[in-house]
Amino acid sequence: MHDSTGSWELPEELRMLRDTIRRFMVEEVKPVEDKLPHDAYTLEPEPLKALQKKARDVGLWCLETPGEHGGAGLSLLGQCVAAEEAAKCRMGAYIAGCGAFGFDPPVVAWKGTRHQQRFAREDVENGTKAFVAISEPSGGSDPGRSIQTRAERKSDRYVINGTKIWISGAGMAKWGIVFARVGESKGRDGITSFIVDKSKPGISLSRIPVIRSYSPYEVHFDNYEVPIEDRLGDEGKGFAFAEEWLIHARPPYAAATIGIAQAALDLAIEWAAQRKAFGSLLADKQAIQWMIADSEVELRAARLLVYQAAWNADLGRDIKVDASVAKVYGTEAAGRVVDRCIQIFGGMGVAQELPLERWYRELRIKRIGEGPSEVHRMVIARDLLSGKRVGA
């Protein structure tokens, strides 16, 4: 990301990717989304398929999926650039690009056997999606100890019993990856991951009523049988199998919140430049100028932290701490920026003809998802206090 002069900028191919997604969002996605109800969670099947075809035609399909499996195979830095731009729509907090770019299967699925990849291949082909089930009613931030869902080995299969909670996308998905405890171990070594097929008996869903534009589920397993060939990795090694994937999900997650906040700031700047109060433009008032300036400072800093984490990952470095730093600062800064933007708009800031109040609600959850800020602060502090200093 540095050229011979020592200046810092994105590689040319990623600038081109950013500009292509930005144009696609403005020219293709926004006109479709503008016709939807304010709190719509998904597009209807026909307009979604039409958008997905257009995205495929310009090479913007399943951006995280490796090229050999039909996706764009972006680096983690590329995924962050794409995530920021694809989030700049009303439903961007949970459905990037309104689903136009497909729904990448969990990357960990590609580490499985060809048989285990069957559902992931269908998702890439058909634009459908999967779910990942880790959190439980007993806890989510410490899954190694809180997972109570059990998988009991019986001959050539496992029988799963238990409940998962806060599972995004489970209602739309045909399959998922579930983490369950096998054997007597109480810690991470007892966790195994499995491919689960929603069409088989023994699995049921119940929707959790939360904010209007978000639809998580409880996923219940009642003597659900999984053949041994659908166990991902070795028994008791579920987290070891997926740990890198879970860590690498954090920079793009933070990047998406930055994209939403940037879109909010762009709206606020445009509003301040034309709205008058007390005889002059809002943009001429120091209070407004400082809110805009503070927002710009925070977004630039957050973006660079995300890019640093992704860049280090692409170089093969351990980014456990970098990812936590980017996730904490990115999600919290994004929330502060949208809060300021609502203040700049005044009463219009919570009007449903604008996306600001929806973004405000949804960004609040982002400080909890993918690990709450407090847990990531623990990760950062332990690194600093250990004397090993894995981070930068």
PLM regions with names:
Residues 1-89, 93-94, 99, 111-115, ...:
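Alpha-helical interface subdomain recognition
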Residues 103-111, 132-133, 185:
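Flexible, glycine-rich active-site loops centered on histidine and acidic residues
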Residues 126-135:
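A short, Trp-centered hydrophobic/proline-enriched beta-strand micro-motif
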Residues 139-143, 158:
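Hydrophobic, small-residue-rich alpha-helical packing segments that form membrane-like cores
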Residues 140, 165-171, 211, 248-252, ...:
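Glycine-rich phosphate/pyrophosphate-binding beta-alpha loops
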Residues 146-147, 199-225:
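Flexible, small-/acidic-enriched active-site or ligand-binding loops
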Residues 148, 156-157, 161-204:
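A short core secondary-structure module
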Residues 217-242:
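A short, charged helix-loop
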